[in-house]
Amino acid sequence: MMKFACKAIALSIFAVTSTFTMAEETNTLSQYGLSFSGNAALTTDYRYRGMTQTQSDPALQGGFALSHSSGLYAGVWGSNVNFGSADPHLELDPYVGYATELPFASKPKLDVGLWYYGYPSASDFNWLELYAKLGFSSVIASGDSLLAAVNYTNDFFGLEEDAWYLNATYTVPFADTGFGGVASVGYTKADDYDFSDNGSEDDNYVDWKVGVTYSVKSVPGLSAELAAVGTNIDANAQPYKRGVETGAVFTLNKTF
């Protein structure tokens, strides 16, 4: 399954980028139903599902995606990482998916795809994950959104073990101020994996985030977020304890 899915991702990205090159040579992207997007971010701590991926140090992140009007998309996202060992220092994740609006009154948006966690200098950590997301807008207040996600892999962190991740994220704008709020809660369950550092054999944990966002009106696409991020992982030793307990994370993000 892993090899097949990886080939599918590679072929999909190649196909989309090839189309992009042809379109650039002959006409604009929009005439081919294609659109390009990207982002760059600087964060004080790369927290993945509540757990630091940089030993609580800052991270520079970014990515790009090509989307087609049919709903198909493919892209790559990257960040520096530090797991406390010599390698890896870079995470580079290709992904491919399909998003569509469902024909219901609330017009929820379904997004399904494959995400490959790649570590070029430590390929033993590489693993593939399947995801499905369902998004709703104007749930409680005008302009808000609720996103529910389910993720599954049979090769968690390259260990050939099953793992599930469930998450719900809610965002809401504060009137027309540019400020907003964000809150999320997630649950991870991994077979034969101990997230504690004291032999508690905790194969599951809960993560959370509560924060405030700000969109800079004078600079389109520029936003900032200050959030409290943490988990209920039972940890005693540093620096692992610091990297899983609740802490403040500031992120500056620019989309284009």
Could you say what each language-model-derived stretch is?
Residues V210, Y214-V216, R242-F256:
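Outer-membrane beta-barrel "beta-signal"
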Residues Y32-L34, S56-L60, P88-L92, P108, ...:
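Residues that define the transmembrane beta-barrel architecture of outer-membrane proteins
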Residues A23-S35, G71, A86, E101-K109, ...:
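Short loop/turn motifs that connect adjacent beta-strands in outer-membrane beta-barrel proteins
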Residues F36-A40, G62, L72-V76, P94, ...:
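Transmembrane beta-strands of outer-membrane beta-barrel proteins
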Residues M1-S35:
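Cleavable N-terminal export/targeting peptides
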Residues E24-N82:
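Short glycine/proline- and aromatic-enriched beta-strand/turn motifs that initiate or cap beta-hairpins
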Residues L42-Y48, G78-N82, T100, Y116-P120, ...:
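Transmembrane beta-strands of outer-membrane beta-barrel pores
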Residues W127-D203:
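Detector for outer-membrane/organellar transmembrane beta-barrel domains
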